[in-house]
Amino acid sequence: MSNLFEPIPYSLWKEDKQAFAKRLGSSFRETGFAVITGHPVKQTVIDEANDAAKAFFALSSEAKEKYHDAEGGRQRGYTPFGTENAKGQKAADLKEFWHTGRKLPADSKYRSTMKDTPVVDEVPEFDAATYAFYTEMDEFGRDLLRAVSLHLELPEDWFDDKVESGNSILRLLHYPPQENPPPKGTVRAAAHEDINVITLLLGAEEAGLEVLHRSGDWLSVNPPAGSLVINCGDMLQRLTGGVLPSTTHRVVNPEPERAKFPRYSTPFFLHFNQDFLIEQLPQCLEEGGKTQPPITAQDYLMERLREIGLVKA
């Protein structure tokens, strides 16, 4: 793996917060990505969520389709193969996925726009296993944002109350085997950027993730086993005026000898609270960051979901 993605040990955060924040921020500035080793997400929680996901995707198309909410923007439940496309792309990605969202209290002001995640009847352990994983990724993501705060010379807890009820999503991805050559111009996930604040991604079983460096080269990301890949999303890029970039990335089709194997992936998309107003931080503008009009996290999300075909324009 390129030294641009040199792993950062999470233990450094416990030993020297400023040193960890500096390394994380430097990696984000250079590539928009970072690799973290020794993360606190329990392996048993990861394994149980992955097993539940594989059991769900093994169900019949008819069974999975029961959990498809096309009218709700597909922000919860199942999205079928060939539905989502990258911004500016006509061809749909070669994937299917499931979204697990935050469980809100009954009196939450966000309940009208943040639906409950459907319970999968056919896989009894699915709800508990995936939400346990969601919870641990959410907690770790907030810890990483504390490091981002320090890097941006903000109070360590600056992000805490801005993401505590965020519309964050655990996406369980399944890229099916390619028994036959895929249609011309299609890939598992076309070049795109993430919409959210930061994304946490566990190392995939099958290779394929590539990042577009500012040099114009596509760089393969093959993190050490058990590590997490973290990347900046468009919301963080907008907040920082581009000081922390949301980098274009993709998942390419497998080599012929690996085409018969499926690929599973579990990105966690950490979002702001829906009513948070995204506007550029003054210190980032002083660095030369780009000014953009203020916009709420929810309005920005819906704008982007329309662009990628998950919400009707």
Roles of regions detected by a PLM:
Residues 1-313:
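Peripheral, non-catalytic segments flanking oxidoreductase cores
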